[in-house]
Amino acid sequence: DSKGNIWVGTDGGLYIYNPILDSFTEFNLVSDKGTIIRDFVTMIRCDEHSNLWISVENQGLFYYNSSENKLQNYLHDAGLANVHRFWLNGNTCWLALYGDNLYYTKADFESPLQPFKDANGDEIFKDDIINCEIVGPHNYTYIASSNGLTEVNFVTGKSRRILDAFARTLEFKSDDELWVGTEKGLYIYNLTTDKITHLTVPDQDDSYALSDNAIYSIYRDSENGMWVGSYFGGVNYYPYQWTYFEKFYPREEIKF
């Protein structure tokens, strides 16, 4: 947050880590609805005003005003408490409910939730599980879900399915290269050529290849290196290629 603290969501509530004191403090502020964050925290996001939004399984969406130290609880009693993921776009809040649909409303939640419909009037995320979203160029947003990778322009409503594999995570390596983590390996989508490269675990051991097909997280660091976290195979690292070189593999039958 703006004070340098790290907010940690767990399966039993929310904690604040102070790196200076090296200490954790439980966040147990009572909301305007008399609720306290006690369940599985599915997501934490900070807005442009340094206020925090927290989605909690079975408890809905919380808004923490850091300057006033006040907590508001939305959707907790509307039968819509299973907020799996959310994001803010100006004064609009987008909410992905687990196995339900993608909805939007004003960030003050004074208007009812509306399901998203594309330009053809179809609810393309109905019964879907949205796992990740990332904003790309030309007003397009890319959404990873249980149904695959979808490209959406929320201004025009135009949408198209790019990939059908169960997608969990997204990260741009560059403006025209999107990495997609799925249960079937890593897909690299080139926005310029509209081509997809599919990387999977090879049939034989290869220290330079992907270690597991179940990709759960992708992160680009400050040096443009790509970190790929998997379910069974640990973490893979792909450094930025300042220069290209050929890899040579050792063979036991050849000795010098």
Give the positions of each predicted feature.
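Carboxylate-rich, polar loop motifs that coordinate divalent cations or form catalytic acidic clusters
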Residues: D1-F256
